[in-house]
């Protein structure tokens, strides 16, 4: 019988060694976010059913009554939250991991004799762990550190790394030190260096599947009723509760709004839950945010819908100012110059910081 092994270790060589050990034994791994409070970790373990946990002082057996079986070929369970906020495990197989790593490596032209990955994002998130997985698959050099630090990254022998926009911003003009920077998480900056590749993906897709707007080899993307759907060998096998979210033809509904043009170029508008309906008109936050972010006096911005007695929801720009913020009229004029008038924010709010996840995505529900 195969076991699920929870790994609660900082980023480093030992984490990678424990992944290798588990796979050599035919087991699967569950990375645990060490920043979670004790009660949250307990809920995660109870919900996803590992048999063992690896911590700083070694491997510990968990209650056998709570352990849940795996299928042959299962390699990885990634914890992600469902709509209830309870942990939901995404199950990937060795085959889906290999498909993702192969597609990414082919697109980036990875040469195991020349290239070296730096893993510096949280390993309990697919954006961080996928760096480790693709390096192991391709046989490249790999350095794993417990968090991003500018000087550590620059001093490493890495040619490739994955970052979120806030980390990229900290690198500044030294980003050209790397051959390729794979960028995920929140919306990218307006101006990007030539060596930066923007990505779109989910835990269910095994990390990025669309690079600079184009699907990776072996990835199919289509739009159905305004929602992006994807198909390919890199998709999850199922959730930990056994539910396979793919339809009979293998398509997975992402929950993201977007479009695919006649040439296959993919545009992602945001989570369908983030769509703002104002006076029966539909407004996606992302295009509005990109315009407002270019204005003088705006360090960061998130666009949300606020309750409105007449329109139902009012488009509202939540701005982290950089010096003197723009006026509401300046924001509205800028948006109306590029988008339909109903997309223009009816209000602005100034805040000190935007709440973000570990991978830099704005937590809109917290605004």
Can you name each region flagged by the protein language model?
Residues 1-36, 119-122:
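Conserved AMP-binding/adenylate-forming
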Residues 10, 63-79, 86, 109-116:
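Conserved pre-ATP/AMP-binding loop-to-beta segment of ANL
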Residues 39, 55-74, 100-101:
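Flexible, low-complexity linker/hinge segments
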Residues 46-56, 78, 88-170, 180:
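AMP-binding/adenylate-forming
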Residues 74-89, 186, 201-204:
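Conserved adenylation A10 loop of the ANL superfamily
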Residues 159-163, 167-215, 220-222:
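Gly/Ser/Thr-rich phosphate-binding loop
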Residues 215, 224-250, 271, 283:
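Conserved ATP/PPi-binding loop(s) of AMP-dependent carboxylate-activating enzymes
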Residues 232, 257-343, 353, 360-362:
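AMP-binding/adenylate-forming catalytic core of the ANL superfamily
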